[in-house]
Amino acid sequence: GLEQPLRDYLYIYRHHKPKIALSEDVVKTLDAWKAEDIRLGLITDGRSVQQRNKIEALGLGRWIENEDVVISEEFGSEKPALANYEYFMKRYPECHDFTYVGDNPRKDFIAPNSLGWMTICIKDDGRNIHKQDFTLTPEQALPKKTIMSLKELI
């Protein structure tokens, strides 16, 4: 029946190599941070194979070491679990200032806010899969700063 073709389609979807690219502004921002010796990490929810394919397609290895990538399926917990964020605090005990940049007020800022991190939300320009509704977001889940573009952080 339908079960086998559905599994086949799911496999294809989860294992395909996406054709995606970073914008020029994002590349410039990441290059600027690398030049300033700013350590970057990535916390993402999802299946490992899909997220790794996206990371590879975007060329993020140029700026982010593999050990600084937390994928929920590999890590064993999803945002907003504290462990996903505390991982970086344990990995870099000499660092005292952490900043988290995200786009989903429902789960991105709760944990880093509770840990005293700077939290920044990139406002949706209409392409985000998560609708941003700050009116329904509890205060502890709100970002400390909102920007329209990553380049504002250079």
Residue ranges and their predicted role:
Residues 7, 11-41:
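Short, acidic loop-to-helix structural element flanking the phosphoryl-transfer center
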Residues 27, 31, 43, 47-154:
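Asp-based, Mg2+/Mn2+-dependent phosphohydrolase catalytic module
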